[in-house]
Amino acid sequence: MNAANVSCQTLIDTLRRTTARHPDKLAIKQHDQCWTYQDFYQRCTRVAGGLSELGIKPGDRVAILSRNSSTFALARYAVAAMGGVLVPVNFMLNANEAAYILNHCEARLLLVGKDELSNAQQLSALCPAIEHMVWMGSEEGLATPEKMTPFADLLSGDALVATDSLDAALPAQIIYTSGTESAPKGAVLSHAAIIWQYASCLVDAEITVSDVHLHSMPLYHCAQLDAFLGPSVQVGGSNIITDDPSPENLLALLESESISTFFAPPTIWIALLNSPMFAKTDLSALRKGYYGAAIMPVEIMKKIQQSIPQIRLWNLYGQTEIAPVATILQPEDQLRKPGSAGKPVLNVESRIIDDVGNDVAVGEIGEVVHRSPQLLSEYFKDPERTAQAFDGGWFHSGDLATIDDEGYITIVDRKKDMIKTGGENVSGREVEEAIYQLPDIAEVAVIGLPHPRWIEAVTAVVVTQAGESLTEELVIDHCATILAGFKVPKKILFVDELPRNPSGKILKRDLRDTHANVFDS
């Protein structure tokens, strides 16, 4: 290794250094499969060698379509070790939606989880650039389907770590955002950006070597992958992985594994509190609770703190493009600043600006912009959107917010009407375009409305063509045939007209105010 590379810090370096410090400590566990850091590191380097033997080169995109598993975590570091670029794909997307991502990023290899066989078989016809499909189910004793390579084959080669040739500024992953346009954007994140974000989480979210994490939210999301799994591995924590987010399974694992650290959107926390098992579960080990993707209702927060008196809560706000954590509301501020996103984390600088780029006054609404080494390098193959996002030298988040006299940021709206439902991002425009395919539709506006379970529920407000009748069931069934399940509206509201401003723009905020109580009953 030459002197120029001695200080190089890539994702595989974080695992290698942890392994040197804690070789025999539990790193990854799922069901009865337990790996120490030494086991985990050795497996990662062997899989890296296996990928290279298949012809995957540094810079190639390696996609993964899988639910949570220990093999997912293994693939994450193996791809990094050989210089590949990981592209996690949301397993809830339908085949056409997933194919767009795979074709756009020009993935050469697709890692397929045990529950995604049907989708993968459709993708083989839709994505001609994919040269190899690797069956992760072989790690759980499942027979390998025809035309797929068993994951076990990747473990049979020589170990490979391309640290000497890796540059921390090179891409480590591309995560596709649920953009406000119909086509998602691929956020390219370098090794360095992700590791800068790890540092922010280690400091501001107080992630430590003694933590035992339960990873139940999807690892295809950068929240679970990069705000919790990655920082935990870097510092040497223990990581329990599950693909079953049901309240009963989560409560059982929280008790049996003595989980100390748990992240979930408010919808999951609410489901845990409402489970008949909750009162019977020993949660005495649970010291740190994290939430994000939506605001935690104050009454729910109080109930969590009353039911688990030793727990401390953090609210994490951010987005894929900043790897992902931008601000954190600390435990001592949860009830003092309810609804706030907190203050910028260690390696992020944030402002709230008006339309001409000036800081807004205290209490005034403006757009959140960031400057940080955590930020994406670019939107993949999209220089125009990249330039727009960094207009003025700051990254434009698209979120509207206020800032108070203590510097606390509160998100008040999403500039482009993104809906966050159950922790998933949904583009209102994408759902609108699906509904507009129905011939009886005159106008439609898709909004998120408060919901006791989903926090925000996708809701379509529809105006039909004159003289036409349309049922809620028909619209929902139509959407279900062309959209992923989490994007399908929970309710269709029929109205005579949509509110507009003087320039003719639909006033979605007025719609949200008018129909705010639809899901109360």
Write out the residue ranges for each language-model feature.
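A short helix-loop-beta submotif of the ANL/AMP-binding
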Residues: 61, 67-95, 103-109, 211-212, ...
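Conserved AMP-binding/adenylate-forming core of the ANL superfamily
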Residues: 3-11, 16, 24-69, 73-77, ...
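Structural core segment of the AMP-binding/adenylate-forming
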Residues: 53-54, 81-153, 466-468
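AMP-binding/adenylate-forming catalytic core of the ANL superfamily
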Residues: 93, 110-112, 262, 356, ...
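Conserved pre-ATP/AMP-binding loop-to-beta segment of ANL
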Residues: 9, 24, 157-176, 182-183, ...
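Gly/Ser/Thr-rich phosphate-binding loop
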Residues: 259-263, 273-336, 349
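Conserved AMP-binding/adenylation subdomain of ANL enzymes
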Residues: 195-212, 220-260, 275
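Conserved AMP-binding A3 loop
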Residues: 36-38, 172-196
